[in-house]
Amino acid sequence: MAPFIPSSHTAIIQHDDAGGVKITPGLPLPVLEPGQVLVKTAAVALNPCDFKMPQRFSQAGTYNGCDYAGTVVQLTEEVEKNGLLKVGDRIFAACVGNNPHDKDSGSFAEYLKGTAKFCWKIPDWMSFEEAAGLSGTCIATACMSLFQSLKLPGTFEEPATKPLDVLIWGGASSVGTTMIQMVKLLGHRAITTCSPKNFELVKSYGADAVFDYRSPTCAADIKKLTRNSLKYVVDPFSDLRTMALADEAMGRSGGKYVALESYQDTHDKKSKLIERELIMGQMILGRAIKLPGDYGKPENPEMGRWGVECYKSVQRLVDDRKLRPHPLRILDGGLEAILDGLEMLKRREVAAEKIVVRL
C-alpha cells in the first residue's frame, strides 16, 4: 500500500530577512525536481552551519537544516526508471539547507526532498538516529577536503602504501572524527588537536597522535613529531589563531591548508609557501553555489560525476561498518527540540557530541 502523503507539512524556516527561524505549519510539500525523492524525516543532526548560515545569508521563507535520515515515500519518474531508490527505502544524506536559490531544500521539516544519487541507504542494523549522526555534511566535507583539495594518494578500496601525515585541527568535533577515520582508511597518519579530556576519544577513532591545542608548544610539538615535513592541514575553525598555529606546524617547504570557514590570510613570510583553499561539503554535488564572496562557486559537472562515485565508495564503508558516527546526544521533542539544540550550539554548550533530534 502506498504511504500516506499529506498536502502540507510543518518545517523550520527563516521568518524574516534578519536570519530568525521559527516552526511554521501549513507549508506546501517540497517541489521535487527530476532525480529527487520525497522523504518522511525520522531524525536530523545539527551542525554549526545551521545557525550560522541564516545569519550570514538570510532570506525569509528559506528552509533550515542539512543532515537527515528518513524513509522514501515518493519518487520522481527519473528515479523510478533508474532504480536507485524505491518507496520504503531508509536513507540518510544532507540537503543544501538555508539556500535562498532553492528555498524548500532543508531537513528541519516533516518532509524533505533528497537527490537520489547523493543519498546512502541505511543498513538494516543501523538506526535512523545513528544514520543521521553519521552526518552527510561531515562526510561530504571530508571527502572534498581529502580527495579534491589535499589530493591525498590512495582510495578507500586501495589505501596508500606510503603513509603521509595529515593534521586535522579540532579532532573532537564531528567533522574531526569523520576526517580521522577517513585519513586512516586512506592509509595515512592522522594527527589531531583537542582538549586533553578528549584525547582517548579521538584515539578511539584512529588518531595516531594528539596534542593539546592550548599548549604553548602545540605547534612546535607537531613540527617535531613530523620532522619539519608536514604538508597537509585541515582546519574547521580557520580563525587567525588556528591558522597561525597550523602555519607554525607546517614543514619548512610549506604545503596545503584546507579551511572549512571563510578565512583572512595572515600574509606572513611562511604563508607564502602555503596554498589555502576554502572547502564546503556541498561542492561535491557539482552545482553552482550562488552565495556572495568566498562561498560562491561555479558549476562543476565533472566534480558532480566524481561525487556520485565517491558516494558509492562511502556506501560500501557504511555497509561494512568501517565508518561510525560521532558520540551522539539524542533529543526527543521534534521540531521544538531542534530549536533548543540550535541554541545549545550557539551557547557552545555541546562539546565532543553530535546533537541528533528524533522527529
From Swiss-Prot:
RNA-binding among keywords: no
Amino-acid positions noted as binding NADP(+) in the UniProt annotation, renumbered to this chain: 49-52, 195-198, 213, 260-261, 350-351
UniProt cross-references to Gene3D superfamilies, sorted A to Z: Medium-chain alcohol dehydrogenases, catalytic domain, NAD(P)-binding Rossmann-like Domain
Superkingdom classification of source: Eukaryota
Residues given in the record as substrate binding sites: 137-144, 281-285
Induction section of the entry: Expressed exclusively during fungal penetration of host leaves, the time point at which plant defense reactions are triggered.
Keyword vocabulary terms for this entry: NADP, Nucleotide-binding, Oxidoreductase
Pfam families named in the record: ADH_N, ADH_zinc_N
Presence of the UniProt keyword Magnesium in the record: no
A molecular function (GO) term: nucleotide binding
Coiled-coil ranges from the UniProt annotation: none
Pathway(s) where this gene product acts: Secondary metabolite biosynthesis
Annotated EC: 1.-.-.-
Oligomeric and partner information: Monomer.
Protein family according to the UniProt entry: Belongs to the zinc-containing alcohol dehydrogenase family.
Function: Trans-enoyl reductase; part of the gene cluster that mediates the biosynthesis of a tyrosine-derived cytochalasan acting as a fungal signal recognized by resistant rice plants and leads to avirulence in Pi33 resistant rice cultivars. The first step in the pathway is catalyzed by the hybrid PKS-NRPS ACE1, assisted by the enoyl reductase RAP1, that are responsible for fusion of the tyrosine precursor and the polyketide backbone.
Name of the protein: Trans-enoyl reductase RAP1
